[in-house]
């Protein structure tokens, strides 16, 4: 059976909802992606920088509690300016060139709700 793999950015604004139980009452797009009954994400590859490690870990734990079948993978990147088109494009290009895609075994999705507008545009390019 083919697996579904999604790529996206950890949303430092939209995915952040604090550390207490109140985080479950806020819409967090990356978490919600993994709560869709009609779409099972087998692996979620989340790009983030070193400053967002803690948020990534919280998100990973929360996803495990609502979608235990989803493997959440940390892809740590270095972006000095997430609003710099050239830098973001180069980062995503390098990521894509270095990724071992297996199109005969996996289907790929891009989650564009999180990340800067520049990142959202660069995913398309």
Residue positions per predicted region:
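Long, low-complexity, Lys/Arg-enriched
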Residues: 1-109, 116-125
């Amino acid at each position: 059976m083919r697996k579904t793999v999604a790529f996206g950015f950890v949303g430092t604004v939209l995915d952040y909802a604090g550390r207490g139980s109140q985080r479950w009452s806020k819409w967090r797009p990356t978490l919600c992606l993994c709560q869709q009954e009609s779409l099972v994400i087998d692996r979620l590859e989340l790009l983030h920088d070193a400053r967002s490690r803690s948020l990534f870990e919280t998100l990973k734990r929360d996803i495990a509690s609502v979608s235990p079948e989803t493997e959440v993978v940390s892809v740590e990147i270095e972006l000095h300016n997430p609003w710099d088109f050239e830098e973001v494009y180069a980062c995503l290009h390098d990521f894509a060139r270095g990724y071992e895609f297996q199109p005969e075994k996996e289907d790929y999705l891009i989650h564009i709700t999180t990340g800067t507008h520049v990142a959202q545009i660069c995913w398309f390019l």
